[in-house]
């Protein structure tokens, strides 16, 4: 019976891993004072009658630590790309040079660094909640399986302990990622 239930636990482990991965993606979009192509991943551009991701209309490169270059493929979309970057809330001011946009990354102020730390903390807390929700779902499913007679009580308790270990591990990885990101944000 235990072998039949193991895939259930691996399914929950996968969901917890996805929460940690999602956090790392969200952290990639936080500006740290260093140029990063992922900084513009969330930018959406009004082009061709619809809203499109920036990477669908241009290529993004990082030639220097404090500069991002955006090469727009269609000259008619350059103004839309510039507007989208300015409106993104990242505090960036692109300089248009033909079909290219040069985006200098200004150093962050102390106040902005503190704000970014708070935002990173919120992202981490959202993913911790997601992990705890997965734990709750797993425990509910285990109790249901016990009630239906698929597993014994001692097996359920053993599996709940395993689910708790998976939860603790995922939350530990989230905390480590947050600590790393906060350190990165505060470096001048």
Curated annotation (Swiss-Prot):
Keywords: Cytoplasm, Protein biosynthesis. One of its GO terms (biological process) is cytoplasmic translational termination. One of its GO terms (cellular component) is cytosol. Its main location: cytoplasm. GO terms for molecular function: ribosomal large subunit binding. It is found in: Cytoplasm. Responsible for the release of ribosomes from messenger RNA at the termination of protein biosynthesis. May increase the efficiency of translation by recycling ribosomes from one round of translation to another. Belongs to the RRF family. This is Ribosome-recycling factor. It comes from Caulobacter vibrioides (strain NA1000 / CB15N).
